[in-house]
């Protein structure tokens, strides 16, 4: 089988992750990160042939300068790779209800991404810049750009999962509903879990936990998403690095009316100053929380609230499994590495038959997958996610 090289772009509001991946075997030829956009220290780091390199992009540089650098400097060193590119895959955070699967980028698709900006105000504008710059930089691949949506996997949710108990007209006229996020990751680890369990995906019942700086839990029944913890935006659900997750909506009125905070200040508080950062008042880094759990009250407090919330979501999603749960799967930076989070969470779920195996749990870290429960226990797995591979495979499939 000949190689199918895909350039995968993930444009954030102040960063751009990129990789060239062979969609046939998952081999990564180049990967990198451009960050600190719009700041004096804007820079780019990349790995090629195992060697790491770094360069300044110039003060105030952003997506356009980063893509120029990728094309004219990094790929210029590898003309053979550049010549073999067959497609460009773009990660898109929010596709609204319009996109239920990955699609080739057209004017209509670009308009659909624009229409979803209110639900992803930081990410979707950055994705549109990435698409525009890619079309400019690779005119030969103009019809080979593919959009892969974080929300697409969750479009199989039934109405009872995605509707809020608000006036129905808010959904009909304004699209206010649950959309979820991290769908590409939840889909990937569901596929991988089916392989581990030697089951067809369409017979798989799992609860997948993508835990990183952002986190979400998804109920997967018969291979399809039936519920997920993130909502209209990625603010709902779990305790996250700097996001509050679930709270009583009336807290917002109290902050405004009694404490005189503006809507913008409340938005900043809930999205950038809450979560682990808010609970520790020190850091959003889960490693600090894990390392200091036994000795510092702030770390213990944050960890306990984090795991309590996570266990509640896993427990509630078992009600959606039609009486059969094949496994709970952990992934994402915290899910793959924070053994303490997994242990404290599963310890709360003894009623469901989970019994952690301490040695297995400690072994399944730093990129290693594996079972983390005892042989007599209900199954829990660690599966490192690979969203870039899904994006590359979808791009290759749709442009073949």
From Swiss-Prot:
Coarse class of the protein's main subcellular location: cytoplasm
Active site per database record: 150 (proton donor/acceptor)
GO biological process terms on file: acetate metabolic process; acetyl-CoA biosynthetic process
Record bears the keyword ATP-binding: yes
Uppermost EC category: transferase
Record: residues binding Mg(2+): 10, 387
Binding positions for substrate per the UniProt entry: 91
Protein role: Catalyzes the formation of acetyl phosphate from acetate and ATP. Can also catalyze the reverse reaction.
Stated family: Belongs to the acetokinase family.
Name this polypeptide is given: Acetate kinase
Lineage: Bacteria, Pseudomonadati, Pseudomonadota, Gammaproteobacteria, Enterobacterales
């Amino acid at each position: 089988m000949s190689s199918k090289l895909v350039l995968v772009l993930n444009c954030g509001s102040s960063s751009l992750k990129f990789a060239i991946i062979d969609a046939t075997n998952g081999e990564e030829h180049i990967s990198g990160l451009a960050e600190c956009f719009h700041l004096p220290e804007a820079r780019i780091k990349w790995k090629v042939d195992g060697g790491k390199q770094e360069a300044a992009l110039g003060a105030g540089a952003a997506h356009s300068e980063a893509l120029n650098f990728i094309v004219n400097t990094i790929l210029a060193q590898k003309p053979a790779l550049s010549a073999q590119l067959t497609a460009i895959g773009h990660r898109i955070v929010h596709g609204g209800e319009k996109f239920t699967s990955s699609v080739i980028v057209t004017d209509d698709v670009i308009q659909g991404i624009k229409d979803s900006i209110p639900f992803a105000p930081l990410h979707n504008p950055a994705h549109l810049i990435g698409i525009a710059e890619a079309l400019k930089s690779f005119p030969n691949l103009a019809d080979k750009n593919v959009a892969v949506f974080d929300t697409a996997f969750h479009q199989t949710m039934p109405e009872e999962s995605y509707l809020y108990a608000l006036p129905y007209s808010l959904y009909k006229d304004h699209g206010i509903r649950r959309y979820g996020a991290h769908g590409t990751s939840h889909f990937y680890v569901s596929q991988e879990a089916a392989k581990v369990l030697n089951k067809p995906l369409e017979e798989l019942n799992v609860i997948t936990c993508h835990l990183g700086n952002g986190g979400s839990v998804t109920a997967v029944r018969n291979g399809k998403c039936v519920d997920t913890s993130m909502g209209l935006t990625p603010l709902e659900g779990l305790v996250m690095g700097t996001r509050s997750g679930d709270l009583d909506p009336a807290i917002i009125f109290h902050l405004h009316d009694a404490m005189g905070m503006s809507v913008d200040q409340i938005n900043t508080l809930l999205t950038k100053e809450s979560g682990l950062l808010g609970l520790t008042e020190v850091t959003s880094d889960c490693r600090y929380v894990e390392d200091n759990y036994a000795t510092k009250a702030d770390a213990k407090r944050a960890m306990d609230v984090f795991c309590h919330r996570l266990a509640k979501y896993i427990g509630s999603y078992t009600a959606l499994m039609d009486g059969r749960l094949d496994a709970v799967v952990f992934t994402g930076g915290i899910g793959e590495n924070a053994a303490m989070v997994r242990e404290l969470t599963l310890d709360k779920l003894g009623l469901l038959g989970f019994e952690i195996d301490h040695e297995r749990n400690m072994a399944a870290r730093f990129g290693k997958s594996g079972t983390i429960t005892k042989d007599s226990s209900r199954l829990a797995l660690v599966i490192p996610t690979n969203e870039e591979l899904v994006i590359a495979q979808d791009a290759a499939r749709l442009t073949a």
